[in-house]
Design a protein with these regions (language model features):
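Non-catalytic, conserved peripheral segments adjacent to functional cores
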Residues: 2-186, 205-209, 214-249
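Short beta-strand His + acidic residue motifs that chelate non-heme Fe in jelly-roll/DSBH
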Residues: 159-160, 190, 198-203
Length: 249
């Protein structure tokens, strides 16, 4: 990095100048940030129309409003099955559950197998669902595959989605959703189709509590994992050696 009259770093030693890096604080292209370092949920929702091919087909991200109640706390609806996004796409969860993730913990990647009708190639099936007739949600086999809809009550969730469905581009979406305890424009829910790998990381300073619904009841045969070593809690090396048994002489 050469020294010029307008160089703010001219006062540094040459070695430091050679190692110097600066950050780009410009907003940058939304699609690139969605697939890279990530965006806030409200940015993704507001920019959906301009994201085009960067958006994973079938994924829904919709805002939720959390009402602050002075001196008492807050109130937030999760969803209504008779209006809004879940009503529009015809998704009525058959099972509800909750989960807690401690600070700095992570889950994933999890993935559920998509149902492919007999006699149809997977790529042709997804082409029909998401390219030829993306608005015809009646063709989606919600009752034969697991879709998830997730809501966050506390903590801050960083979510990463990867489209692994045959014949569709491998898109990545990365965004952040705060829980209801941090009310604001980024409070949102997310719908994840089968065949889309998903990982969650609690990047807040409190436990993350989530509530999620699934389009079918739990089926252990549909619980896939990809690159999920982050979920393991390995024992200390000394413990592993001890548990392996006495050393042979």
């Amino acid at each position: 990095m050469s020294s010029t009259p307008n160089d703010p770093w001219a006062g540094l030693k040459p070695d430091a100048r050679a190692r110097l890096e600066t950050r780009d604080y410009s907003s940058g292209d939304l699609a690139l940030r969605l697939a890279g370092g990530g965006v806030n949920a409200s940015e993704a929702i507001a920019g959906r129309d301009q994201l085009g091919d960067a958006w994973i087909p079938g994924v829904e991200l919709f805002q939720r409003r959390v009402y602050q109640q002075k001196g008492r706390g807050y109130f937030g609806e999760l969803t209504r099955l008779t209006e809004g996004t879940l009503d529009r796409i015809g998704l009525a969860p058959r099972q509800w559950a909750s989960a807690l993730m401690h600070r700095d913990s992570a889950k994933g990647f999890h993935i559920h197998p998509p149902h492919i009708p007999e006699g149809i190639e997977p790529a042709a099936w997804f082409q029909k669902l998401y390219v030829e007739s993306p608005g015809d949600v009646s063709q989606r086999p919600y009752d034969r595959e697991q879709w998830d809809v997730m809501f966050f009550l506390t903590g801050i969730c960083e979510m990463i989605l990867v489209d692994e469905r045959e014949g569709l581009p491998r898109r990545v979406m990365r965004f952040t959703i705060p829980g209801d305890s941090r009310a604001g424009p980024d409070n949102a829910a997310v719908v994840i189709p089968s065949g889309v790998a998903h990982a969650l990381r609690n990047i807040g300073n409190e436990d993350l509590i989530m509530v999620y619904g699934t389009s079918t009841v739990f089926n252990p045969a549909w619980e896939g994992r990809i690159a999920s070593d982050v979920e393991k809690a390995p024992l200390h090396a000394d413990w592993d050696r001890y548990l392996a048994g006495p050393a042979t002489i």
